[in-house]
């Protein structure tokens, strides 16, 4: 056969293939996709753990039915309760479907201490979060989660500086609330709560992160909020797809996030260069009291390879913005709805005002100190009760299996690459642990502390930042969320500023009832499109 004739074989074969729009063509494409998915599941995906039951599937099942996966997506809360009461509370592990093709291995709470004691080369938290967040696609590298030193600084440096930044935060809250809630003392204003709180939290958190004036730059703040939305979409969509397809969506989201990072760098890079120069050449000058400065000082000591890598430092700011803004905005929305919704029964707003007037002064001229804010036991209770019921995620204490021979405490082998976790929402609403567990009782935890004090007993460990196997909003153990102390401080300051300076209520059409949260798969979301009414209180 000649070379010319052999080159004609390709077009001839293509001509013989069925058209893609024909029934045979559609069937062929479907068959190819099914074969690809089968190969992905058998070769690329982490196998199902042997011997661990699959919820709502017959004994011995090795994959989830489409029905069970649909139930996870559309009605996950009952599935979580079933997993908790029928398996986990009985000391048994169980597998749940996850988003897309994922599977989730849940261990019982009685194995948590043992699980957390395993070294990182056996069970790794950073690698687990890197996979859950799909950060290698969104930010181009998993180091921003696996080696998240920008977050550890919050724990070890920023928390010590809270006293210094407290009144700066008070000034920032005045600035942003005057703009978002208004200053009218005569007329009620209807607030679209979600976008309003998003901007409030973005500005307040940015005062901690990058300081003035950048924290008031609306383009910068919107950039942070838009990037956070891309992170959530990438984690859900890319993480839920078969591994063979992830490069397509992951690359797309990497490009979208990259464009946001490029925009952010026009603000961050000049600021970084200025701060690095000051730290190196003018150490005698007063230092800005914000996270960016602490990051630079840490990087000069411990990460010299990154300190003048402007792209890497910018991406760490992006990662920190997500941690500082996203969950806090959700919890502040829940907090305000819960305070207003419980006011008729518990007189919540007046009780909080009394405590804050006593600790902060009845006018707005005094300084806000760390000790005063930490003494707000009733505000602490109101906030802890809100996150008990409003945690965004239904699971915590994530770990990724890093070895080939791992077995759980009770002997179940889990394949390398398995993601395991512990259920949180059903444990945090268990009636055996919390009386009327699904009810929002604002002073549930402060009552427990006050009753213990009246008996001369030690206060129970029920503060906002306290974690336990039955209270996992911030995780548990040495890897618990390092930023929870800052979130605690921030939420108390926001709550104090609102109740001291504004009257708040629901619109009349709500008839005094708090709109319910809604679940998307296992994500517990505040109600969308919710409004509140606000009016500035006249100064005494």
Give the label of every model feature segment.
Residues 2-19, 521-540:
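C-terminal helix/juxtamembrane-tail motif
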Residues 4-145, 470:
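N-terminal membrane-proximal hinge/A-helix region immediately C-terminal to the signal-anchor transmembrane segment
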Residues 77-84, 358-412, 418-421, 425-427, ...:
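Conserved cytochrome P450 K-helix E-x-x-R motif and the immediately C-terminal K′/meander segment
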Residues 98-101, 107-210:
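Charged/polar low-complexity intrinsically disordered regions
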Residues 165-332, 351:
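Cytochrome P450 heme-thiolate monooxygenase catalytic core
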Residues 328-355, 482-502:
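Cytochrome P450 catalytic-core helices
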Residues 422-461:
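Conserved cytochrome P450 K-helix/beta-meander segment immediately N-terminal to the heme-binding cysteine loop
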Residues 467, 478, 484-522:
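Cytochrome P450 heme-binding "Cys pocket" and the immediately downstream C-terminal segment
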């Amino acid at each position: 056969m000649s070379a010319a004739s052999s080159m004609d074989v390709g077009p001839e074969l293509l001509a013989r293939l069925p058209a893609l729009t024909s029934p045979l063509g559609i069937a062929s494409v479907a068959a190819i996709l099914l074969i690809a998915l089968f190969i992905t599941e058998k070769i690329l995906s982490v196998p199902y753990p042997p011997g661990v039951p699959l919820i709502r599937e017959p004994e011995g099942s090795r994959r989830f039915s489409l029905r069970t996966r649909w139930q996870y997506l559309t009605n996950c809360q009952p599935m979580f309760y079933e997993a908790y009461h029928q398996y986990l509370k009985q000391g048994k592990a169980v597998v749940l479907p996850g988003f897309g093709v994922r599977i989730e291995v849940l261990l019982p709470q009685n194995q948590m201490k043992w699980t957390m004691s395993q070294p990182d080369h056996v069970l790794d938290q950073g690698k687990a979060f890197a996979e859950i967040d799909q950060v290698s696609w969104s930010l181009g590298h998993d180091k921003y989660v696996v080696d998240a030193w920008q977050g550890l600084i919050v724990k070890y440096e920023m928390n010590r500086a809270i006293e210094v930044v407290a009144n700066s935060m008070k000034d920032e809250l005045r600035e942003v609330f005057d703009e978002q809630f208004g200053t009218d003392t005569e007329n009620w204003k209807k607030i679209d709560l979600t976008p309003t709180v998003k901007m409030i939290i973005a500005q307040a958190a940015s005062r901690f992160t990058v300081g003035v004036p950048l924290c008031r730059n609306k383009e910068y703040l919107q950039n942070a909020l838009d990037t956070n939305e891309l992170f959530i979409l990438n984690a859900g969509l890319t993480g839920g797809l078969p591994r063979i397809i992830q490069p397509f969506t992951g690359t797309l989201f990497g490009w979208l996030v990259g464009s946001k990072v490029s925009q952010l760098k026009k603000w961050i890079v000049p600021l970084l260069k200025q701060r690095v120069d000051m730290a190196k050449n003018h150490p005698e000058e007063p230092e800005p009291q914000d996270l960016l400065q602490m990051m630079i000082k840490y990087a000069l000591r411990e990460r010299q390879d990154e300190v003048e890598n402007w792209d890497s430092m910018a991406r760490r700011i992006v990662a920190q913005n997500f941690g500082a803004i996203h969950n806090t905005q959700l919890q502040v929305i829940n907090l305000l709805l819960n305070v207003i919704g419980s006011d008729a029964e518990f007189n919540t707003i007046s009780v909080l005002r009394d405590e804050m007037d006593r600790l902060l002064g009845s006018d707005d001229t005094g300084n806000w100190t760390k000790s005063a804010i930490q003494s707000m036991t009733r505000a602490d209770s109101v906030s802890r009760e809100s996150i008990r019921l409003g945690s965004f995620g239904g699971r915590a204490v994530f770990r990724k299996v890093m070895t080939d021979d791992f077995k759980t405490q009770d002997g179940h082998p889990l394949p390398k690459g398995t993601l395991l976790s512990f259920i949180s929402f059903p444990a945090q609403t268990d009636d055996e642990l919390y009386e009327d567990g699904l009810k929002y009782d604002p002073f549930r935890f402060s009552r427990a502390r006050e009753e213990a004090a009246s008996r001369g007993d030690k206060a129970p460990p029920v503060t906002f930042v306290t974690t336990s196997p039955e209270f996992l909003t911030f995780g548990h153990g040495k890897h618990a969320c390092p930023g929870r102390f800052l979130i605690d401080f921030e939420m108390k300051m926001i709550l104090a500023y609102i109740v001291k300076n504004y009257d708040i209520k629901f619109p009349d059409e709500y008839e005094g009832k708090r709109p319910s949260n809604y679940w998307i798969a296992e994500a517990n979301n505040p109600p969308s499109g919710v409004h509140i009414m606000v009016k500035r209180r006249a100064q005494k």
